[in-house]
Amino acid sequence: MAADRYPHLLAPLDLGFTTLRNRTLMGSMHTGLEERPGGFERMAAYFAERARGGVGLMVTGGIAPNDEGGVYSGAAKLSTEEEADKHRIVTEAVHAAGGKICLQILHAGRYAYSPRQVAPSAIQAPINPFKPKELDEAGIEKQIADFVNCAVLAQRAGYDGVEIMGSEGYFINQFLAAHTNQRTDRWGGSYENRMRLAVEIVSRVRGAVGPNFIIIFRLSMLDLVEGGSTWDEIELLAKAIEQAGATLINTGIGWHEARIPTIATKVPRAAFSKVTAKLRGVVNIPLITTNRINTPEVAETVLAEGDADMVSMARPFLADPDFVNKAAAGRADEINTCIGCNQACLDHTFGGKLTSCLVNPRACHETELNYLPVRAVKRIAVVGAGPAGLAAATVAAERGHTVTLFDGANEIGGQFNVAKRVPGKEEFFETLRYFRKKVESTGVDLRLNTRVNVQTLVDGGYDEIILATGIAPRTPAIPGVEHAKVLSYLDVLLERKPVGKAVAVIGAGGIGFDVSEYLVHEGLATSQDREAFWKEWGIDTQLEARGGVAGIKAEPHAPARQVFLLQRKKSKVGDGLGKTTGWIHRTGLKNKRVQMLNSVEYLGIDDAGLHIRVCEGEPQVLVVDNVVICAGQEPLRGLQDGLVAAGQSVHLIGGADVAAELDAKRAINQGSRLAAEL
C-alpha cells in the first residue's frame, strides 16, 4: 500500500478551521499567464489539473498589492473588485476539482524592475538598475493597507487563503535586514522595529479576513547575504508572526541577489530542510520546508525525520500534475520528475516568456496542448530514442497510435546518457527512468541495437516516419586536430576514455561547461552531499553566522585536473547559458580554478600541446595532455532524402532538425507537439 510507504506525506493536516488532505504544498511560481489575454482561463485549467492530481494546497504566482509593488511594470496586481472578479474562474475551477488554493501577495520593493519602486531606504539593489524611493510614515501605512486590501479581495474572489511573501529579499524582507533598512524611526533601527512591518501586515490581515482563512507567512530563514538576519532574529520574528495570527510558516531560502545556488540541479535534494527543522518547537503552528524536494521518497523522509509539517514543491508539479495521485496509488515510478534545470520555468520567467517545463511541455499550455485519443490509428516509426524520439513515441502511443521506436544503442536516452554523467545533472537518471516506464506503459514497440535504413522503413509500411536521429559532434578545422591527444566530448562523457591531468576544452557552450565540470570533479559530486555542498558554497553549517554566510569561507574540493575552457567569441565565457543558472556554472568552475579565455584563435595541436593566440596577442602554447572538442554538432539526416524520394511522410525533430546547440527542452516540446497533431 502506498499509504504505508508515504504515511507522513499522505497524512491530512488539521488547521483547526479546515483540513488539508495531505502534506503537499504547490509552492508559488509565476507563470506569465497572470498578465496574458485569456490568462485567467488558462490559469484555471493549470491549477485545476494539479488539484485533480491530489495536491494538498496550492499557492498562485506572486500578485502585487499595488502598482509600485509589481515585480515589473504591468505585473499582475489585485487591488480592485474588478480584478478580483477575474480570479473567480480560478478558484471555482480549483474547488470543483477538490483542491484548495491561496493567493500569494508579493511586493517587490527595491527588486521591482520599475522607476516607481519603493523601499524602507533608498538603497539600490545590486541586481536592479533602479534606485528605490524611501517611504515616509504615510507611505508605509499605505503599503500595509494595500496588503490588507489585497487579502480581503482574495477572500472575496474565493481563495482559501493568502501567502504573504516575506522572504527572498522582497519588500518585507528588506525591512527586516539592517543593510537594506537604515531608518531611524519606529520602522528601523532595532530588530523589534525592523520586524514591525511584517508583524503589522499579518496582524491587520488577520483582523480583516477573520479566523477561518489561511494565512501563510513566507519567512526568510536563511538569507545567504552578508547583512542578513541572525538565527535569534529569525526565531523572534517567527514567534511574533505566530502571535499575529499566521496559520502556517513557509521557509524562504536566499535573497535573489545571493550568490549561492538554492534550487538549481547542482543543489542537493532537500538541501535546506534542516534549516526549517531548527525552528521546530520554537513555534506551535505548522512549518513548511522547501527547495529541491522532487520525489515522494525525499518528501516522506523530510517529514519522517521531523524537519517540517509540510513540504513545498513548485517545479515538481509543473513536471507532473499527478505527482501526489501517482504516489498514493503506488505508481511513484511513473512520476515525471523535476530535474531542477530551470530552463523552461525560471529562465522563461526572467526572460519575459510563458513558464513551462522541460520534461512536461504541457505545463501552462493545458488549454491548447492535449494528448487526445486518435480517431484513426496510424502505424508510426520513430528512429532515435533520445529526448525528441522518446517524447514523440510515447505521446503518439498514449493517444492510441501503433508506434515502433528504433535505436542503434543498447539503451534509450541518446544525449540524456551524456548529460547524466555530468556532476550536478544526476537528475537525468530520473528522466530516463520515467521514459523507460512510459515506453512500457504506452505499448511502444522498442527495438534497441537496431539500425534501420531507407528500405527497412519503406518495407515497414508506416503511415508516418519520425526521424529523431540526433547529431554528430563537429570537428573544427584546426591544424593537428587528428592528433592522438584530441578527444570529442562523447569520448569523454559517454565512452569515458582516459583524460590527463591538464586539459584544454575547445568550445564554451553548454557542452563545454558540462565537460569542464566533469573533468574537475572526482568522487561524489557535492550535488549528492548536503554538507559538502554547504561547505563548497560557504554556508554556515551551524546556522550561527548572520545571514548564514557572514565570515564563512567557501571550501570547494581541489580540482581533479587543470582545465582551460576556451572560446573564439569575444563575449563573456558562458554568456549563452541559462539566465538563472549560468552564473552558478561559471562560479562553480572558477572555484575549481578553471581558466576561462575568450577571443581565442586556435593555431594548432601537436605533442607540445594546444597552440593559441588570445585577443590578437602573441602565440602561446597550453601544455596539456588532452584537447577536448566541444565545438558544436551536425544534424544526422542521412535517411531523410531517400525516404522523401520513396514518397514517405517524414518528420524531422530534435537535433536532426536543429543541431546548433543540444536542447532537450526544444526536443521534448517538438516531439510532443508533433505527436499530439498526428
Give short role names for the model-derived ranges.
Residues 1-383, 387, 392-403, 411:
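Flavin-dependent oxidoreductase catalytic cores
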Residues 56, 160, 247, 309, ...:
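Conserved acidic residues
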Residues 202, 366-375, 398, 402, ...:
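Flanking helices and flexible, charged tails adjoining ferredoxin-like Fe-S electron-transfer domains
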Residues 259-265, 286, 309-310, 416-424, ...:
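Short beta-alpha connecting loops at secondary-structure transitions
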Residues 307, 439-446, 482-485, 559-561, ...:
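A short helix-to-beta-strand connector/capping loop
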Residues 379-405, 447-461, 469-478, 482, ...:
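Rossmann-like dinucleotide/flavin-binding elements
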Residues 414-462, 574-600:
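N-terminal Rossmann-like dinucleotide/flavin-binding domain of flavoprotein oxidoreductases
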